[in-house]
Design a protein with these regions (language model features):
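Conserved long alpha-helical elements within nucleotide-processing catalytic cores of c-di-GMP signaling
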Residues: 1, 7-30, 37-67, 73-77, ...
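The cytosolic transmitter module of two-component sensor histidine kinases
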Residues: 10, 51, 55, 92, ...
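Active-site-flanking beta-strand signature of metal-NTP-handling nucleotidyl enzymes
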Residues: 30-35, 72, 156-161
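Catalytic-core segments of nucleotide cyclases and related cyclic-nucleotide turnover enzymes
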Residues: 48, 93-100, 104, 122-149
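Catalytic core regions of nucleotide second-messenger enzymes
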Residues: 74, 102-120, 148-151
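Catalytic strand-loop-helix junctions within cyclic-nucleotide turnover domains
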Residues: 83-92, 109, 116-132
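Acidic/His-rich, divalent-metal-binding segments that scaffold phosphate/diphosphate chemistry
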Residues: 136-204
């Protein structure tokens, strides 16, 4: 019932635990669903080894942010989920804030880790936990869209810093190449996400 890469519980365990809590009738129960920002671009630029390190860092951040009785699982490739038993919405919201804060100050990785989060709470017996999970997931995707521009910019800057550190050329030269690539990209009518990718490639 454990994920080999992160050591967290896997999705099967998460779903079994949901069923058990549902049957017990315990509430409030809060659910957090998270999706790692920048995993694909990290894999593309630095390889899957660096992407794995990002996933492991997020797992450690979740463990540090949550409490002993919370159930933390790797839900999918870049998704994580947390069950917070007997936890109201406000307490769960503060845990989400803690996750964000630790991500922002995390120093043990080449890139800055970040994760989009969604939260919902079962507050009475008329609610089903599967619906709470769905609502938390929907909120996560909405938050990811709202945050995507700023978070992607942060990921790009973080990756650029790493590229500069790994490069034998001067940072000034790399910045000139990036500036020229951006001008060319705009002349070609590239979209913002394509310009971001071009910016990273120009720094290689």
């Amino acid at each position: 019932y454990h994920d080999k890469l992160t050591g967290l519980f896997n999705r099967t365990y998460f779903e079994k635990k949901l069923e058990k809590i549902e049957a017990s009738g315990v509430f409030p129960t809060s659910i957090i669903i998270g999706d790692v920002n920048g995993l694909k671009i990290t894999n593309d630029i630095f390889g899957h080894g660096e992407g794995d390190e990002l996933l492991k860092a997020i797992a450690r951040i979740l463990e540090k942010s949550c409490r002993k009785n919370d159930i933390i699982a790797r839900w999918g490739g870049d998704e994580f989920s947390v069950i917070l038993p007997e936890t109201d919405y406000e307490t769960a919201r503060r845990i989400c804030e803690r996750i964000k804060k630790i991500c922002e100050t995390y120093k043990d990785l080449n890139i800055q880790p970040s994760i989009a989060l969604g939260l919902d709470t079962k507050e009475n017996n008329t609610q089903k936990l599967k619906d709470v999970v769905k609502k938390a997931e929907d909120r996560m995707y909405r938050n990811k869209l709202l945050e995507s521009k700023s978070k992607k910019s942060g990921t790009v800057l973080s990756l650029q810093r790493t590229l500069f550190e790994k490069s034998y050329e001067t940072e000034e030269h790399a910045l000139r190449i990036i500036e020229l690539s951006q001008k060319l990209g705009r002349m070609l009518g590239l979209h913002e996400n394509e310009l971001d990718d071009l910016k990273l490639l120009a720094g290689l």
